[in-house]
A protein has these predicted regions:
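SF2 helicase motor core recognition
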Residues: 1, 23-24, 38-86
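Conserved helicase ATPase core of P-loop NTP-dependent helicases/translocases
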Residues: 6-47
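Conserved RecA-like P-loop NTPase ATPase core
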Residues: 30, 53, 106
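Hydrophobic residues at beta-strand termini and immediately following loops
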Residues: 14, 62, 92
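A conserved SF2-helicase RecA2
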Residues: 66-126
Length: 126
């Protein structure tokens, strides 16, 4: 749908079926300041560890997981070394759906981690 509105040249898609040899090319193109890409669409688990998206200014969650660490890893991808932008995070959640329950559960998990591990629980997580 994004491609219909903004055109194919402005959207990069990166999913599980994306061939390994294309993945770094897609990420590098998105990171290039001269790139016409305005959107990077992917799934949190697809990139594996180490993917960097410091060109991002907005992260939109449209598919959520009960695993808090998967979400935090997604946020880290936009906050690696080289990030110069303020990053906004948006949850797309339909009322009375499982996503609404997932978001509530993530909030409770984050709150509990803060109580158990201290002010910055992420320092304890590996």
């Amino acid at each position: 749908e994004i491609q219909k509105v903004y055109g194919d040249d402005s959207v990069a898609a990166y999913f599980g079926e994306t061939p390994q040899e294309e993945r770094q090319k897609i990420v590098s193109t998105f990171q290039d300041k001269g790139s016409e890409l305005r959107f990077f669409v992917g799934q949190p688990r697809t990139g594996g560890y180490g993917i960097t998206l410091h060109a991002a200014t907005t992260v939109i969650y449209y598919s959520n997981s009960f695993d808090l660490e998967i979400r935090l890893q997604s946020e880290d991808r936009a906050h690696r070394i080289g990030q110069e932008n303020k990053v906004t995070y948006i949850d797309l959640v339909s009322p009375k759906t499982v996503d609404e329950k997932i978001i509530k559960a993530l909030g409770k998990k984050s709150e509990l981690a803060g109580k158990v591990l201290g002010e910055n629980p992420r320092d304890w997580l590996v």
